[in-house]
């Protein structure tokens, strides 16, 4: 029996875990979610590792989750692709990398590597930076500088020492490379148009402006003394003995930006690649004739060379709905809007025929623990109005709160975030059921299920725990061995629509 509208409701970062300590999902009062879990068919899904095209044991994330959900198949992720190419040796023959290295040899200029110094595997992996250093040595590049971004979010909040020491060990092993600047990801990897943050990173890289230190460990020591953890380290310059910067980015240099996930690499890349950039005044030292390489395709708005080009995903859920003349709505607040649009559509920027999008602005606060409800109420107000207007056959909705507040590593704000989302969930599901529709309530990965470790430390990273799935249709059962790729086929099943052969996921309905 076909249902309309069908809403796929993604509670971002809402994982399931038996241990209640540090578990905001367990601590939160969430009467609506609990009622749906008890009343309707439900199961759990794997959202990590090889189930979503990542290496075994790797935690999932929002980009990967939405790609898999929208594609209806396991999508092999950039991390897996790059790792494989290093293992098989293709990485070291990559023509895009070779051209960048040839460029600096010809111009007698420097190669700069930008990247998140972390093995979190969400935005980057430090092994990829190590591989580039090996390759630069093989290619006889003489001057290589690393501009390192500190994580503290997908890994422990004060774990940077491990990565800075590892990087120095690699420089020593290869006999090449120096650390030039160090930045908290809060600055260098902003994705919310807070150009004042990005400008601090740019000015450190190009002008050598900002706090200066003899080495990365001295910088860390100073930051920690001032209660600044890795993520928030102020963009800083590493200097030689005489106090001059180790390196700045200059005319004719080359850059390889070694993050593979686009969303937090776009803004900094635009600063260096776009002639018509208007975010801030780049000044007279803006590097000219810069040879800029992105590890993966970041965006149409970034004018750089791409080392690992995208693999095309045909017949994602959005495309199939459009082909079969179903209307669809994508709705989220700023922080997760790219996920329900670009990533959900398999890396496609444009809307499909019959697709509408609603973007609700995320609140302008320094960190979301200060406003745990974020813009959930505004998203819900807009969506309930759309449901009552009966315009859309399918709705893709993301509530950002459990993930974005969960990254704070603070229990109380994350509990509040979930309670706000639960209130909103009740309003959305009520509106759907009143119209004879159905909801699939699920998540893309875990996070809020562990925000404090068992020994009381903040846990800011995602988890590998299973995620829930509830289908608000009685009289059916759901199988227990599902993965995120099974959600799109389930949407099509509820609609009574045909599933394309490219979708290797299977409906969760038994």
UniProtKB/Swiss-Prot annotation:
Belongs to the BPG-independent phosphoglycerate mutase family. InterPro entries: Alkaline_phosphatase_core_sf, BPG-indep_PGM_N, Metalloenzyme, PGAM_B_sf, Pgm_bpd_ind. It is an enzyme of class 5 (isomerase). Pathway: Carbohydrate degradation; glycolysis; pyruvate from D-glyceraldehyde 3-phosphate: step 3/5. One of its GO terms (molecular function) is manganese ion binding. It catalyses: (2R)-2-phosphoglycerate = (2R)-3-phosphoglycerate. The active site is at 62 (phosphoserine intermediate). Its EC number is 5.4.2.12. This is 2,3-bisphosphoglycerate-independent phosphoglycerate mutase. The modification Phosphotyrosine is found at residue 36. Binds 2 manganese ions per subunit. Essential for rapid growth and for sporulation. Catalyzes the interconversion of 2-phosphoglycerate and 3-phosphoglycerate. Its cofactor is Mn(2+). The keyword Metal-binding applies. Keywords: Glycolysis, Isomerase, Manganese, Metal-binding, Phosphoprotein, Sporulation. Mn(2+) 1 binds at residues 403, 407, 462. Mn(2+) 2 binds at residues 12, 62, 444-445. Monomer. GO terms for biological process: glucose catabolic process; glycolytic process; sporulation resulting in formation of a cellular spore. PANTHER family: 2,3-BISPHOSPHOGLYCERATE-INDEPENDENT PHOSPHOGLYCERATE MUTASE (PTHR31637:SF0). HAMAP family: GpmI (MF_01038). GO terms for cellular component: cytosol. Substrate binds at residues 123, 153-154, 185, 191, 261-264, 336. The gene is gpmI. It comes from the Bacteria.
């Amino acid at each position: 029996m076909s249902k309309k509208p069908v809403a796929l409701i993604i509670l971002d970062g809402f994982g399931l875990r038996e241990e209640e300590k540090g578990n905001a999902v367990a601590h939160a009062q969430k009467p609506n979610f609990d009622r749906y879990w008890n009343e309707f068919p439900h199961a759990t899904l794997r959202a990590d590792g090889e189930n979503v095209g990542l290496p075994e044991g790797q935690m999932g994330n929002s980009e990967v989750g939405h790609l898999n959900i929208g594609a209806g198949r396991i999508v092999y992720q950039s991390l897996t692709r790059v790792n494989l190419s290093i293992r098989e040796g293709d990485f070291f023959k990559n023509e895009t990398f070779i051209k960048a290295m040839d460029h600096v040899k010809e111009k007698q200029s420097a190669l700069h590597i930008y990247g998140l110094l972390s093995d979190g595997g969400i935005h980057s992996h430090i092994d990829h930076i190590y591989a580039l250093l090996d390759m630069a040595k093989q290619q006889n590049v003489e001057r290589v500088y690393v501009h390192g971004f500190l994580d503290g979010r997908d890994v422990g909040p004060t774990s940077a020492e491990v990565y800075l020491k590892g990087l120095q060990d690699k420089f020593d092993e290869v006999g090449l490379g120096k650390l030039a600047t160090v930045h908290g990801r809060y600055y260098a990897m902003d994705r919310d148009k807070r150009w004042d943050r990005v400008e601090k990173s740019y000015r450190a890289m190009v002008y050598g402006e900002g706090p200066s230190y003899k080495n990365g460990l001295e910088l860390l020591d100073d930051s920690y003394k001032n209660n600044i953890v890795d993520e928030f380290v102020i963009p800083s310059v590493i200097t030689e003995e005489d106090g001059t910067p180790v390196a700045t980015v200059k005319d004719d240099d080359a850059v390889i930006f070694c993050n593979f996930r686009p969303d937090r690499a776009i803004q900094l890349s635009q600063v260096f690649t776009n002639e018509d950039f208007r975010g801030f005044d780049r000044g007279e030292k803006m590097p000219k004739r810069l040879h800029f390489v992105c590890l993966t395709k970041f965006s149409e708005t970034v004018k750089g060379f791409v080392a690992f080009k995208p693999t095309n995903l045909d017949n994602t859920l959005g495309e199939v709905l459009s082909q079969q003349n179903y209307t669809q709505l994508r709705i989220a607040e700023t922080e997760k809007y790219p996920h329900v649009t670009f990533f959900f559509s398999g890396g496609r920027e444009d809307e499909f025929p019959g697709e509408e999008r609603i973007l609700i602005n995320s609140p302008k606060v320094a960190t979301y623990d200060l406003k745990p409800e974020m813009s959930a109420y505004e998203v819900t107000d807009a969506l309930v109005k759309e449901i009552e207007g009966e315009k859309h056959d399918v709705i893709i909705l993301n509530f950002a709160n459990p993930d974005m507040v969960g990254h704070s590593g603070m229990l109380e704000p994350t509990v509040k975030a979930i309670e706000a989302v639960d209130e909103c969930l009740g309003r959305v599901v009520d509106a759907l059921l009143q119209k004879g529709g159905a909801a699939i309530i699920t998540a893309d990965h875990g996070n809020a299920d562990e925000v404090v470790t068992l020994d009381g430390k903040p846990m800011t990273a995602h988890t590998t725990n299973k995620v829930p799935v509830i289908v608000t249709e009685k009289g059916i059962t759901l199988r227990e061995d599902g993965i995120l790729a099974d959600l799109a086929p389930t949407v099509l099943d509820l609609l009574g629509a045909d599933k394309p052969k490219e979708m290797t996921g299977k409906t969760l309905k038994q």
